[in-house]
Amino acid sequence: MMALMQSLVALSIDAMLPALTEIGQDLGARAANDSQLIVSFLFLGLAFGQGVYGPLSDTTGRKPAVYLGFTLFLVGSLLSLLATDLNVMLGGRFLQGLGLAAPRCVIVAIVRDQYEGPAMARVMSFVMTIFIFVPAIAPTLGQGILLIAHWRAIFATLLGCGLLTLAWFALRLPETLSVERRIPFSLARIKAAVIEVCSHRVSLGYTISLGLISSAFLGYLSSAQQIFQKQYQLGTMFPLYFAILALCIGSASFVNGRLVMRFGMQNLSRWSKRFSTVISLLFFLYVLSTGGQPPLWTMMGYMMIILFCFGIMYGNLNAMAMEPLGHIAGIGAAVMGALSTLISVPCGILIGHSYNGTVIPVISGFMISGVLIVVVMHWVETVPSEPVSETD
């Protein structure tokens, strides 16, 4: 259930990728790259929303916070469905993201309520496996809808999926935060919790690393349709190539779930970051030598490797960032999610809007984020760990 709720985020992002150009033309986008904002504004809503639902879930319980989020998502889906210009569409997408922040944030707290350490990393990896399987089929779903209906039918499908998922959640999931563990809502408490999260070296460092990973990934997502459908002229075959790459992340998450109990979160993350950074540096030099137009098979090979490494790191970094925050799991997940998304959205928009008919901006994004992740994680791992709070 957690995986499928999380997958609604992926479905809302990826199902309309094949339709971005058509949506932009119908709604009066002034430039081709402006259509990318349909993806970016959902992430912007996610960033702002996560700062709300964590504290709310600590006060009212996990389920009421999710109910509020789904309500906003359904309103945003309806607004996007009926949009007649790009600004209205972007408003609807922002509301969708604002609503989807609830399952994205609160799910981490729900899992942390019941698991910790490698066990939590294992659960999160399996959640990510299904979460990534959805992007493998979402563009195909969107392309299939476009073959038989208008692009607005994609948003009608999202509206229906939201209603079904909300009903399943309401009927089947018990509340995981008991009444005695709930904390009264207080701005002072929120401020103290934010300070604690941001001053804890481990949580802050791994959260920044998550933001850097997401930056490169958002830049890739924003320009994937232009790269594959236009630059490589794949047309309706775009969903197939996108699915192959999405499955690389999903398979990595599955593999990580199998290996993390044996090798540990830090070791798997450390080797994945090193390997992906070296590969990115080498491929960037190769891309420059081709004028930003590498053969499709080399581009696919590189992306398969880099996304597999990112899939290994993502679940582990989430778990390691949350490890010291068990006593403030709700707001801890909120701050972690909001901070990482606020890092990724502007950087991802910059990468996507830099698309110039070559893959240089996207590969640059992966290379630069890889180097920065190495620096940040080295800073985290070489400084002695801080003592764990007695309340943890």
State where each predicted segment sits.
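Extracellular/periplasmic helix-loop-helix junction of adjacent transmembrane segments
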Residues: A19-F48
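Helix-breaking motifs and short loop linkers at transmembrane-helix boundaries and internal kinks
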Residues: A29, G61, L82-V88, G99, ...
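Conserved MFS/SLC helix-loop-helix module at the cytosolic interface between two early adjacent transmembrane helices
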Residues: A47-N87
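Structural signature of the two symmetry-related core transmembrane helices
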Residues: P64-L78, L159, L268-F283
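Paired small-residue
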Residues: L72-L79, N87-L95, W297-M303
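Helix-loop-helix hairpin linking two adjacent transmembrane segments in secondary transporters
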Residues: V88, G117-P118, R122-L171, L177
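Cytoplasmic helix-loop-helix junction between adjacent transmembrane helices
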Residues: G92-F133
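Juxtamembrane intracellular "pre-TM" segments in multi-pass secondary transporters
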Residues: P174-Y206
